Curated annotation (Swiss-Prot):
Glycans are attached at residues 27, 31-32, 121, 150, 263, 437, 519, 531. Residues 19-40 form a propeptide. Residues 1-18 form the signal peptide. GO terms for biological process: adherens junction organization; calcium-dependent cell-cell adhesion via plasma membrane cell adhesion molecules; cardiac epithelial to mesenchymal transition; cell migration; cell morphogenesis; cell-cell adhesion mediated by cadherin; cell-cell junction assembly; endothelial cell morphogenesis. Residues 39-144, 145-251, 252-366, 367-474, 474-582 form the Cadherin domain. Ca(2+) 2 binds at residues 51, 104, 136-137, 139, 172. Cadherins are calcium-dependent cell adhesion proteins. They preferentially interact with themselves in a homophilic manner in connecting cells; cadherins may thus contribute to the sorting of heterogeneous cell types. This cadherin may play a important role in endothelial cell biology through control of the cohesion and organization of the intercellular junctions. Plays a role in coupling actin fibers to cell junctions in endothelial cells. Associates with CTNND1/p120-catenin to control CADH5 endocytosis. It is a single-pass type I membrane protein. It comes from Gallus gallus (Chicken). GO terms for molecular function: beta-catenin binding; cadherin binding; calcium ion binding; protein phosphatase binding. Ca(2+) 3 binds at residues 138, 140, 170, 172, 179, 224. Three calcium ions are usually bound at the interface of each cadherin domain and rigidify the connections, imparting a strong curvature to the full-length ectodomain. This is Cadherin-5. One of its GO terms (cellular component) is adherens junction.
Length: 773
């Protein structure tokens, strides 16, 4: 009866608390002049929920309330099954269970409630713990959950040390008066251990020695308040004595300091913290956790199972520019130490960790790992597509220079400036390539103007969109042939077309003939093809074995393009069934596209230009040679004659070189000699062998010079000194010319014109005064 009254008072306590708080709040509101701040308390109903409720989920458990008058207040819970089985409505405090509960598995849940400001997550009130109990009915006798229980106790434990707990399940709630209460009794081994009504087995002696007896087997009996027992109301408990683990790990130093570069890899080792544990190795099971400065999203502490050290590792990349130093506290504890062995100093050891992040020269960081640009093909106006951008993540904030590193086979048509601008040196052709890929590198510019060795990369993709710039071309699978006796309407061949441009879903080709006078007709098909059929028939191989049929193919692009293609149709002999029996094979002839014609014209123009260039160079070479030869002629422009007494003004007689050059103009020997020149008269025959050979040689050389188109006039005549054995005039020197007794007649020199005036005066008898000198 006392238990019933106690439980009833606990149930009513929150209600009285709620009324008392209302009264306090009313008093606070009525006293506007008071500046005293009243304490605000948590208020909620005691929460119970029955197991295996049949109604749909979720099930309402209770309501969290508080006297905080903040409209931005929000409730949150944590603890056992918080936010999994139990969830709270953040704004009104209603708690719901999202799973059907089973009291036989868990009878109660301990949770903690918080109330925070949802704007800044600041706590408005201290957290408070509460329990959600699962109730059931009393309809079963107690049954042990297992037939054999195992327990252990440290050796030499004091009297009453808890060893283990046995559990017998009963549908009744042992905490509620009036329901069946399970009690336990040891029927074997009660001289060493005792059991209480909750099923906890404790030591009955303080001198249990593991070395004397390492294990005990006892039998426990369970019954309810009515004394109901069943066949499964007894269980065996095996208790083993273990070595004592009565010491907690302790940090060797109150603080640890580590320095790591910011480019440390995720999962790399930052440092190790060491603890001391004087227990045996099998008792060392240190656990590390964060206490202050919660950086568990940045670092993790893993215990080394062999050395018991705590290894600190980063869980994500570090950034010196964002956080240069981390400071937090960690604790080391051993959850396996029995609470009965707690010693002064507590079960926790705390140490302060300082991690200093050092700066590392990092490569530039692109704003994106991949850039994509689209450009219309053959557009001469587009020179710049856009730009890529990267920045220096370090504190120096250096300038960045961009460069192209790698490119696809066609990527040379895309360039990158130092500032990251993507440029096109010339329009792109989608038919040549529809996609251009390049890799852009970013490097920092150092203070001395050099580029940093570290660089980062980004991909640039240039997509070329199509325009209608290619005319369709004719496609047919085989050589077209027609029988002489083909009937009108006979289909000769089905033709189709192809287009290098993209064909839109609504694209189509139009076929037509250039003339209606042929013996063929064209019919378009719905599938973008056309049939070539016989129009009138009555072909005659004797008249024409080959028919050339021009076909015009147009697309529906913008602008519309077309091409003329020629079908070469052979007329063949056929049998009565229409099978070909004899037909000359002809090479397929189709129209030449505009691109092919342009290529042909370019080749022809190139050949002509090369030939013209060669001719020009040859003429220039001749001009240079002629300049040199004129210099030689100018040197020999004067014929100088020396004799022993001096010739006076007659020693040098000038003559005009242009007169000599005019003898043969443009390489053609003039047929009419100017009046100023006398025709050369051959001297009469002379039996003297020396004079004849000299005359013949000079004449031959003169004729060769006159007929040589490649030599200039001043190269044609030379002074030859003939020293043959039978030469009569052995020398042209004036020392002998005057006293020569030769009977050779040199008067013919007067007939050779002014060019030979000096020779005529030296060797001739009478100069011709009619010559114009």
């Amino acid at each position: 009866m006392k238990k019933l009254i106690l439980l009833f008072s606990l149930f009513l306590a929150p209600a009285f608390s709620y009324k008392e708080n209302q009264k306090i709040n009313q008093n606070f509101s009525s006293n506007n002049t008071s500046h005293k701040r009243l304490k605000r308390d948590w208020i909620w109903n005691r929460m119970h929920i029955r197991e295996e409720i049949d109604s749909p989920l979720p099930h309402h458990v209770g309501k969290l309330t508080s006297s905080v008058g903040n409209k931005n207040a929000m409730y949150i819970i944590e603890g056992e099954s918080a936010n999994t089985i139990f969830k709270v409505q953040g704004y009104d405090g209603d708690i719901y269970a999202f799973e059907r509960l089973d009291r036989e598995k868990k009878a109660e849940y301990e949770l903690t409630a918080h109330i925070i400001d949802r704007r800044n997550n600041r706590s408005l009130e201290p957290p408070s713990k509460f329990i959600i109990k699962v109730s059931d009915i009393n309809d079963n006798a107690p049954i042990f959950v297992q037939k054999i229980f195992n327990g252990s106790v440290p050796e030499m434990s004091r009297l009453g040390t808890s060893v283990t707990k046995v559990t017998a399940e009963d549908a009744d709630d042992p905490t509620v008066a009036g329901h069946a209460t399970v009690t336990y009794q040891i029927i074997k081994g009660n001289e060493y251990f005792t059991v209480d009504d909750s099923g906890v087995i404790s030591t009955a002696r303080a001198d249990l020695d593991r070395e004397s007896q390492s294990a005990y087997e006892i039998i426990v009996k369970a019954k309810d308040a009515l004394g109901l027992t069943g066949e499964s109301s007894t269980a065996t408990v095996i208790i083993r004595l273990t070595d004592i683990n009565d010491n907690f790990p302790v940090f060797k130093h109150p603080s640890f300091h580590f320095r790591v570069p910011e480019n440390i890899s995720v999962g790399g080792e930052v440092g190790r913290v060491k603890v001391e544990d004087i227990d045996e190795p099998q008792h060392r099971n240190t656990k590390y956790s964060f206490v202050r400065g919660d950086y568990r999203d940045t670092f993790e502490i893993i215990a080394n199972p062999f050395t018991n050290e705590g290894i600190i590792r980063p869980k994500k990349p570090l950034d010196f520019e964002k956080v240069a130093e981390y400071r937090f506290d960690i604790e080391a504890t051993d959850h396996n130490v029995n609470p009965a062995y707690y010693k002064p100093g507590g079960s926790r050891s705390i140490s302060t960790i300082t991690i200093e992040v050092t700066d590392v020269d990092e490569p530039p960081v692109f704003t994106k790992l991949s850039y994509e640009f689209k450009v219309r093909e053959n557009d001469p106006e587009i020179k710049t597509l856009g730009s890529v951008w990267a920045h220096d993540p370090d504190a120096a904030k250096r300038k960045i220079r961009f460069a192209r590193r790698r490119a696809s086979p066609n990527g040379d048509y895309v360039r990158v400036s130092d500032s990251g601008i993507i440029q096109l040196p010339k329009p792109l052709d989608r038919e040549f390539s529809s996609l251009y890929n390049i890799t852009v590198a970013a490097q920092e510019i150092l203070e001395d103007g050099r580029l940093s060795d570290r660089e980062s990369h980004a991909q640039v993709h240039v997509i070329v969109t199509d325009e209608n710039d290619n005319a369709p071309e004719l496609v047919y699978p085989e050589e077209p042939r027609v029988c002489e006796n083909a009937a009108p309407g006979k289909v000769i061949i089905r033709i189709s077309a192809t287009d290098k441009d993209e064909i839109s879903p609504g694209g189509f080709f139009t076929y037509s003939l250039t003339t209606e006078d042929s013996n063929f007709s064209l019919t378009e098909n719905p599938d973008n093809t056309a049939n070539i059929t016989v129009k009138d028939g009555q072909f005659n191989r004797e008249l024409a074995k080959i028919h050339y049929l021009p076909v015009i193919i147009s697309d529906n692009g913008n602008p519309e393009l077309s091409s003329t293609n020629t079908l070469v149709i052979s007329v063949c002999k056929c049998n009565e069934k229409g099978d070909f029996t004899f037909c000359e094979e002809r090479a397929k002839q189709v129209g030449v596209s505009v691109q092919a014609l342009v290529a042909i014209f370019i080749c022809i123009f190139t050949i002509i230009a090369v030939i013209a260039l060669l001719i020009l160079l040859r003429k220039r070479h001749k001009k240079d040679l002629s300049g040199l030869r004129r210099n030689v002629a100018e040197i020999h422009e004067q014929l100088v004659t020396y004799d022993e007494e001096g010739g006076g003004e007659m020693d040098t007689t000038s003559y005009d070189v242009s007169v000599l050059n005019s003898v043969r103009k443009n390489g053609i020997k003039p047929e009419v000699v100017p009046s100023a020149y006398a025709q050369v008269q051959k001297p009469p025959g002379n039996t003297t062998s020396g004079a004849g050979e000299m005359e013949m040689m000079i004449e031959v050389k003169k004729d060769e010079a006159d007929n040589d188109r490649d030599l200039l006039p001043y190269d044609t005549l030379h002074i030859y000194g003939y020293e043959g054995a039978e030469s009569i005039a052995e020398s042209l020197s004036s020392l002998e010319s005057g006293s020569s007794d030769s009977d050779i007649d040199y008067d013919f020199l007067n007939d050779w014109g002014p060019r030979f005036k000096m020779l005529a005066e030296l060797y001739g008898s009478e100069p011709n005064e009619d010559f114009v000198y």
